[in-house]
Structure formats: C-alpha cells, structure tokens
C-alpha cells in the first residue's frame, strides 16, 4: 500500500538495520500481516501504543453518541488486549504468516487469493449458521474432552457434521475451498499465536529480559492458561456474525486435536492440497470408539 521498503538511515534496532515504507495515502495504512521485503518475508504489526489508540478511536466511533462518555473503553481494552503477552502472541501470529510465505509461498498466495470470496460466503443463511453452530459445539467438545477416545469420537462427529452442512447447504466447491484455505492460513497462525503463549506459561525456567520486567502489563505468562481456556471457548461463539474470524478458531482447534492424535502432523501441513480436516480425519479414523462409564458405546 505504500512505496518501496527503505533502510532507516543512521539507526539500528538490536544491532540490525530496520526498514520503513513511505505511505502515499494517509488513509491507506498497512494491515497486520506478512510483507515481502526484498526476498525476505517479515511480519508487520502495529505498535502496541498505536493499537491501543486505534482501538479507543475506532470503538468509540461505533457507539451511539450518548453512550460514548459512559462506556469504559479503556477497561475493554485491558480485558481484550491489555496484557503484553497477548500483543506478543499476535506478533507471533503475523510472524507465522511470514513463515508460511517462506516455506510454502504458493499456498500462501492461493489462500490470500481466496480472501475476496468472503463477500459471497453465506454468512446470513440461517440454516447454514445453525449447522455451523452444531459443528463448532462438537469441535469444542472434542478439544476439551479428557479421554482420548471421547475426543476422537467428537472429532469424527465434527467431520460428519461438516460434510452434512456442506451437502445440505449445497456449498459450492469454490466455497469449500475458501473454508479450507482460510483455515490453513489463519487457523494455523492462530494456533501458533496461542500455543506459543501457553508453552511460555508452562516453562519452569523462564526469565524475562530485564527491559520488559518494568512493564506493568507484562505478567511473565502467568495468565496464559486462563487466556488459553478463554480462547478455546470462543470456538463456540463464532456463528451469527459475518467475517472469517470463525476460520481462525476452527482451524486452530483442529490443530490442537492434531497435536493430540498425530504429533507429526505439522510436516504434512505444508504439502499441496493437504487440509487440516483431512489430516484430522486420518488421525481419528483408527481411534477406538468411546465407551461411557456404563459400558455403552457412543456413536
């Protein structure tokens, strides 16, 4: 959206040169994503300060005038994005897109090429949204189930409901591809965003850099297990709203299940025409049926 990337003269960041891009239109700012700087993919993300300012201004503009003085916008920011760890996770999300561009540039391009289909997706179809809700409820149940056989059974049910939704809703091959592409692109990035925070929180020998120790919004990842649970719960809340955010969460949840049933799945995820749902189907088809405490097999 701007001019060529240029090395910032007479300055370095952590001993390395860094780049800037002149904007030709102040109304057209770069999105949070990955950019190609020369022949290198790199993450791009608003600074934490600018993100906060943009949130305050944008949120207030969406409110009716009479509500603007009384809605606690600053409190909402702290609840949604206030922790520094959350910002670091978002940066990991965008860095993962750069990794996708490095490892599988063709797949990244195809997934981005599919993005305009969002405007034609049947977000407002009531029957489709009801089917999506059932699908996501079962996906959440699979992710949170304790016994592996129960989780596998829920995962198989999720895949069956997905197939039935597409069939009964006469979803075109183009739209099916759109779902799969966006889950691969954004679902995997969401997975990376959350898992890296969870792993940091579980580390027993983590010590933050001194420079971040004085940040009052940084909690050394101690709040990340709670954040993980909150983010998993969002899987069930993705219907009855337009926009592709649901693919972030449905893709992420499939990644969590793949970790459970086939830990080597990540190497396969880069191959052409390999989708998360296909990897999951293969992973759970051999799992034993779930048997309840009463000895009854759950179908």
Q: Where are the regions that the model predicts?
A:
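Post-HExxH zinc-binding segment in Zn-dependent metallohydrolases
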Residues: 29, 102-171, 175, 179-226
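Extracytoplasmic/secreted envelope proteins and their assembly/folding machinery
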Residues: 92, 186, 190-193, 251, ...
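Auxiliary, metal-adjacent structural segments of Zn-dependent hydrolase domains
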Residues: 1-70, 84, 105-111
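Glycine- and acidic
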Residues: 73-77, 170-178, 235-240
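Non-catalytic terminal regions of proteins
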Residues: 1, 236-299
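Active-site recognition of the HExxH zinc-binding catalytic motif
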Residues: 89-102, 190
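Short pre-active-site segment immediately N-terminal to the catalytic Zn-binding motif
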Residues: 72-91
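Extended hydrophobic/aromatic segments used for targeting, binding, or gating
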Residues: 200-258
């Amino acid at each position: 959206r701007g001019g060529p990337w240029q090395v910032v003269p007479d300055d370095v960041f952590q001993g390395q040169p860094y780049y800037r891009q002149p904007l030709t239109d102040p109304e057209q700012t770069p999105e949070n994503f990955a950019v190609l700087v020369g022949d290198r993919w790199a993450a791009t993300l608003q600074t934490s300060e600018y993100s906060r300012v943009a949130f305050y201004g944008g949120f207030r503009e969406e409110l009716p005038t009479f509500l603007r003085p009384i809605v606690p916008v600053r409190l909402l920011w702290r609840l949604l994005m206030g922790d520094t760890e959350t910002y670091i996770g978002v940066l990991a999300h965008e860095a993962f897109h750069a990794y996708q561009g490095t490892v599988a540039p063709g797949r990244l391009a195809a997934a981005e090429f599919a993005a305009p289909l969002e405007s034609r997706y049947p977000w407002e179809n009531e029957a489709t949204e009801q089917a999506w809700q059932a699908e996501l409820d079962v996906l959440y149940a699979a992710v949170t189930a304790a016994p592996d056989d129960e989780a596998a059974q829920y995962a198989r049910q999720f895949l069956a409901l997905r197939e039935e939704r597409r069939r009964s809703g006469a979803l075109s091959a183009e739209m099916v591809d759109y779902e799969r592409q966006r889950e691969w692109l954004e679902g995997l990035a969401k997975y990376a965003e959350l898992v890296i925070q969870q792993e940091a929180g579980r580390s027993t020998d983590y010590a933050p850099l001194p420079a971040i120790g004085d940040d009052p919004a940084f909690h050394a990842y101690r709040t990340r297990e709670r954040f993980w649970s909150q983010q998993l719960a969002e899987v069930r809340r993705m219907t009855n709203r337009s926009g592709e955010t649901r693919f972030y969460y449905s893709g992420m949840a499939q990644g969590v299940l793949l970790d459970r049933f086939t830990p080597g799945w990540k190497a396969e995820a880069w191959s052409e025409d390999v989708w998360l749902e296909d990897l999951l189907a293969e992973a759970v088809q051999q799992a034993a049926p779930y048997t309840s405490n009463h000895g009854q097999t759950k179908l």
